[in-house]
Amino acid sequence: MFSIEFGLTFAILFFKGHREAQERLEPLMTKIDFKKTQKALYLPSAKTIELIDVPPMQYAMIDGKGPPGNDTYIATLGWLYPVSYGIKFRSKLELKQDYVVPPLEGLWWAEDYSAYTSDRRDEWLWTMMIRVPDWIDQTIFDACVTKAAIKLGNSPATLRLETLHEGQCAQIMHIGPYKDEGPTIAKIHNQFIPDHGLIENGLHHEIYIGDPRKTAPEKLRTVLRQPVRERETA
């Protein structure tokens, strides 16, 4: 549903030289890839909606409003990627723990749900975020924000390090263009959740797997996740 090409390009250009230098320094360091160590969170079935227990995880987050691709959205990605790569490099150099920067994720909602069904994108609300390993503390996060600000200027007011605990969730992998997610999302909300005696318990969550600049639209992979809880009975 949502474009992330600008943010990816910005991050690559911003940190290309730094990244190459650091990789030469520690060529034998083990690199953790959460997509491989926690496959259930990032690579669910594309055929069947599943229930999964999602543990608490911390993220670099920024809030915004409006259609993806507007100035606020582009500026958000222009901050999230540099800060996230800055954290990765500091973790590698100072803590001797290397990892693959996790994929971009987004929480999406609207004060009036019909804003989605009628495609009133100016009313869309969102939080874009990138996972930060649990061994990273606020001090390191703040230092990376300060460093990014040298080139980017004042940081967004909502840029923060925050823990998200979704708990039980329904999720499935959507394969195809972002704009074609609608029927799958509807199936989660209108069929799977009520059929299992559940109700929504959080915001619609998307995880964008892979690089949309290098992937044909029909092969794009997006995790569609909805926190749920048991429906109370009288």
Question: What residue spans do the PLM features occupy?
Answer:
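A solvent-exposed interaction/effector surface
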Residues: 25-234
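Short, Lys/Arg-enriched N-terminal segments with co-localized hydrophobic residues
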Residues: 9, 14-28
